[in-house]
Amino acid sequence: MKLDLKILDARMRDYLPAYATTGSAGLDLRACLDAPVTLQPGETTLVPTGLAIHLADPGYAALILPRSGLGHKHGIVLGNLVGLIDSDYQGQLMVSTWNRGQSEFVLNPFERLAQLVIVPVVQAQFNIVDDFAQSERGEGGFGSTGRH
């Protein structure tokens, strides 16, 4: 799949989104910063990537997801948990960065911060009904299928 990428900050030419391995599902996104940013515990900040994408095809969307190592080791996750990039969005990719950890965290310029995953999208149409055909599960939720 070819994807239109617009470089909004010339410094990002050296830090384009890339797959870390041949089996990677996510492209690494980097922090487009002029200087280090310190996030105190509980603090959230919006970090620019210096890049914009245009998927164009409504059959696709992009998800911005946290990097597992940053979340597990440092408590750095996304403030909005998942960023959804619609196919018609053309603005800069921004990363809502939240320090849910107990220690301050310093984010350095061009550090890998999040990952971008391209996913297929199905736009559903609703069929209004009065009742559903009975399923085995029915209305059971939140633990209704058991713990183990």
UniProtKB/Swiss-Prot annotation:
Pathway: Pyrimidine metabolism; dUMP biosynthesis; dUMP from dCTP (dUTP route): step 2/2
Similarity-based family: Belongs to the dUTPase family.
Function (record text): This enzyme is involved in nucleotide metabolism: it produces dUMP, the immediate precursor of thymidine nucleotides and it decreases the intracellular concentration of dUTP so that uracil cannot be incorporated into DNA.
Cofactor: Mg(2+)
Binding of substrate, residues: 67-69, 80, 84-86, 94
Disulfide bonds: none
Taxonomic source organism: Burkholderia vietnamiensis (strain G4 / LMG 22486)
Record-level Gene Ontology MF annotations: dUTP diphosphatase activity; magnesium ion binding
CDD domains from the UniProt entry: trimeric_dUTPase
UniProt xrefs under InterPro entries: dUTPase (IPR008181), dUTPase-like (IPR029054), dUTPase-like_sf (IPR036157), dUTPase_trimeric (IPR033704)
Protein name: Deoxyuridine 5'-triphosphate nucleotidohydrolase
Top-level taxon: Bacteria
Catalytic activities: dUTP + H2O = dUMP + diphosphate + H(+)
Class of enzymatic activity (EC top level): hydrolase
SUPFAM superfamilies in the cross-refs: dUTPase-like
PANTHER family reported in the protein's UniProt record: DEOXYURIDINE 5'-TRIPHOSPHATE NUCLEOTIDOHYDROLASE
Biological processes, Gene Ontology terms: dUMP biosynthetic process; dUTP catabolic process
EC number, as in UniProt: 3.6.1.23
Sorted UniProt keywords: Hydrolase, Magnesium, Metal-binding, Nucleotide metabolism
